[in-house]
Amino acid sequence: MYRDNTKVVKIGKCVIGGGNPILIQSMTNTHTEDVAATVAQIKELTKAGCEIIRCTVPTKEAALAIKEIKKQIEIPLVADIHFDYKMAIMAMENGADKIRINPGNIGGTDKIKAVVDVARERNIPIRVGVNSGSLEKDLIEKYGGVTAEGIVESALDKVKIIEDLGYDNLVVSIKSSDVMMCVKAHELIAKQTNHPLHVGITESGTIFSGSIKSSIGLGLILNQGIGDTIRVSLTDDPVREIEAAKLILKTLGLRKGGIEVVSCPTCGRTRINLIDLAGKVEKMVSGYDLDSVSYTHLTLPTILRV
């Protein structure tokens, strides 16, 4: 599988790539400057099963807040940088375990080099992120529109910028809200780089549509052995992202644990309020992350039929 051959990258205490388990990420939707609110949400996400958290760092205050946030959380923190390279540097100086940038958005080579120099000094991985919504005009013209090929070329061009500066502690992400375009892009890039890949369907939507789009897209990608970390992007409480991501991994056989609730879809023979009962049971067992339940000399599968 592709993921068995990707480079090993250390993010805080976590290790990805090289066949290591796929880790689940999410992103806070608090103002990072609000340390108390951000820490509270990260702790809630950690309890739900989040293993890496990303926070936006648009201001100096947000970058400085990372130091205090890091003191109070247990999982690695990724600083999300959009345009100001100085925020990337400040975030790393204040304890970020990884930064996410699009080199095309933060300025010339001198600014990228300044970021890379600090990352190299502190051995902090850089996630090179490319989104179909911000694809360069020349690539749109070259491929006759926004395409998987264009997304991949854009990402690899940006990876090369950093590699040419002598740094390869990298993670790559290529995202699109078009599910099949995203799948194709990952199939293409997995053949052209051995950097670990962060996988997700960007702006996938609300809890219903977003979960369906993400399960199809991530399922098709992960089942080919592609992907080292994942995020299910939802317009909802970030905890729901973790719940969906865990279920996707379990369904693909890429993660164990928990109790699977199997229930009848109901029909005219049903004599109880099974819909309500199944929902209550699923909620009751949602916190159990056990591979199996031991009962005397038997080991029972963790499937509960309602």
Regions found by a protein language model. Give the residues of each.
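Non-cysteine beta-strand/loop elements that form the S-adenosyl-L-methionine
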Residues: N102, P125-G133, H198-V199, R255
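Glycine-rich, proline-tolerant flexible connector loops at the mouths of alpha/beta enzymes
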Residues: K47-E68, P103-G107, L170-S177
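Active-site mouth loops of central-metabolism enzymes
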Residues: I22-A36, V78-I81, I140-G150, G205-G210
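Alpha-helix-loop-beta-strand connector modules within alpha/beta enzyme cores
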Residues: A62-A79, V118-N123, I189-N194
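Conserved small/polar residues in nucleotide/adenosyl-binding loops
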Residues: T296-T302
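N-terminal amphipathic alpha-helix/helix-capping segment at the start of soluble metabolic enzymes
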Residues: M1-Q25
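Conserved, mostly hydrophobic/aromatic
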Residues: I24, D80, V128, V172, ...
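Catalytic alpha/beta core domains of metabolic enzymes, predominantly
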Residues: I140-V293
